[in-house]
Amino acid sequence: MEQWSFPPQFDNAYLPPADARYWFPRRETMPPGEREHAILERLKDVTRYAWNHAPFYRRKWEEAGFHPDQLRSLEDFEAKVPVVHKKDLRDAQSRVPPFGDYVCVPDSEIHHIHGTSGTTGRPTAFGIGRADWDAIANAHARIMWSMGIRPGDTVFVAAIFSLYMGSWGAMTGAERLRCKTFPFGAGGCQPRVG
C-alpha cells in the first residue's frame, strides 16, 4: 500500500509481508528523477497547505514576495522560500499563545505537546496533530523496517523521554510496527511512583 495523499492519511493496519525488503517499495526504489518530481509535488502541496492554514507562513512568505504557485523546481524552493528562525517561532508564540499561528491544525486537533531540546536557552513547545503523529509513527516504523525490525520484536528505546520529540518518535514507530517496546531513559534508579 503506497500512501501519497495530502494531507497524509495512514492505514495504521498496514504492514508489508514479513519477508519484504521495503515498507513502500515504489517510493523507496524509484529512480532519482522520479523521486525529485515526487518531492517537488509534495512540497507544492505542503506550501499550499501552510499558506491556507497558518497565518504565520502566509505573512512571512508575502513579506518575502513568495507564493506557493511559484514553485517550479527544487531550486525554486531553496531560492524563494525564506528561512524560518527560532526567534520567528518564539515571537509567534508570544503573539498567539501557546503555540503561535504557525500550527496548521485547530487547537482541538492537537494530540501531543512536545518541544525542542532547549539548546538555545529554553525549550520551545509545539503542538502535534493526530495526522502528524501518525506520520511520525509511520516514518519511524519504515526506518525500523529497513533495519530488519519486524512485528513482535523487542525494541529498547534508550533515550531521554522529555518534551524532546526524538525518543517519542522512536517509541511510537516501534508501537506502530507492533513491536514490544522497552522505553528506558536517563534518570535516577529510584522508583518515581511510591
PLM regions and their residue ranges:
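Nucleotide 5′-phosphate-binding alpha/beta core
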Residues: 1-115, 121-138, 145-146
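Conserved adenylate-forming
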Residues: 2, 45, 52, 64, ...
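Positions that flank functional sites
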Residues: 76, 159, 188-190
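Catalytic micro-motifs at enzyme active sites that drive phosphoryl/nucleotidyl and oxygen chemistry
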Residues: 103, 160, 192
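Short glycine-enriched loops at secondary-structure junctions
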Residues: 110, 133, 160-163, 187
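Short acidic, glycine/Ser/Thr-rich loop/turn "cap" segments at secondary-structure junctions
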Residues: 120-128, 152-159
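Conserved ATP-dependent adenylate/AMP-binding module captured primarily in the ANL superfamily
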Residues: 137-154, 189-194
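Conserved AMP-binding loop of ANL adenylate-forming enzymes
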Residues: 145-173, 177, 181
